Regions:
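Bacterial N-terminal signal peptides that target proteins for export
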Residues: 1-11
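Bacterial lipoprotein signal-peptidase II cleavage site
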Residues: 6-7, 20-34, 38-47
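Bacterial N-terminal signal peptides
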Residues: 11-20
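N-terminal low-complexity, Pro/Thr/Ser-rich intrinsically disordered segments
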Residues: 41-77
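Secretory pathway targeting signatures of secreted, lumenal, and periplasmic proteins
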Residues: 75-132
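Surface-exposed amphipathic alpha-helical segments
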Residues: 92, 197-229
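Short, surface-exposed beta-strand/loop micro-motifs that present aromatic residues
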Residues: 105-111, 182-192
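Signature of long, low-cysteine stretches enriched in small and polar/charged residues
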Residues: 138-189
């Protein structure tokens, strides 16, 4: 089984993952913020907060702004903080050069039903410093997905753990470019000596690829990902 290894830390200035974590559609993954964003344009450059999806549900970004918390995006290979090992499920591949600059890792399904719109799983990591309450991060984790156009939850969302660290997961359907899509995001809080690290993994695909995403996330990523602080 293939494995993606990320050694995460600080040192990169704050820039605009949740999915999300994910790109929606053919190599077009765009997040408005390192901490929570979903999708709209095909760009590998760091996006800005102005593109963040607005809505009635409070988000992690709202919490960060209201409490003047400093957010630092983390990239794979940065020395000095948690080591995160993501297993690449069978039938999936590392996204390679199509991985956005703001993501720490991404993977894509090899045999999609629609070749130019394959299922994707994208991970982002960021560090928060200041008056940060991990419980609040998990409380507001579902906000951005709930603000997506036409979002209909497949579950009520649930608290869980990933590699022993507290997490929150939510999945549902939403509309983009007139097409029904499925999206799921797991947000994980990882306490560190110099701040709170947050991992967000977002899976996104056309709605009829739900089974593909479920197979990858529940049978491989959720059970085989390891985090070493």
């Amino acid at each position: 089984m293939k494995k993606l290894t990320a050694v995460t830390t600080v040192g990169i200035t704050a820039v605009a993952l949740s999915l999300a974590l994910v790109g929606c559609g053919s190599n077009t993954k765009t997040e408005t913020n390192a901490s929570t964003s979903i999708t709209t344009t095909a760009s590998k450059a760091a996006p800005t907060t102005s593109a963040e999806a607005a809505g009635p549900n409070k988000t992690i970004q709202d919490y960060i702004r209201e409490n003047q918390i400093v957010e630092t995006p983390i990239h794979r290979g940065d020395p000095g903080s948690p080591t995160i090992d993501l297993q690449v499920p069978p039938g999936w591949s590392d996204a390679g050069p199509s991985t956005p600059d703001w993501a720490y890792d991404a993977m894509v399904y090899d045999q999609p039903k629609v070749p130019d719109d394959p299922p994707r799983i994208t991970a982002i990591v960021f560090k928060l410093t200041g008056n940060v309450d991990p419980a609040k991060i998990l409380e507001y984790a579902p906000g951005e997905l709930k603000n997506l156009p036409g979002f209909e939850p497949l579950t009520n969302g649930n608290r869980s753990t990933l590699s022993g660290f507290d997490a929150f997961s939510l999945s549902g359907n939403y509309m983009k470019d007139g097409k029904k899509r499925v999206i799921g995001r797991k947000t994980v809080v990882i306490p560190g000596q110099d701040g709170l690290y947050v991992l967000q993994m977002t899976a996104d695909a056309l709605a009829d690829e739900l089974g593909t995403l479920m197979e990858a996330t529940t049978k491989v990523i959720d059970v085989q990902t390891t985090i070493t602080p």
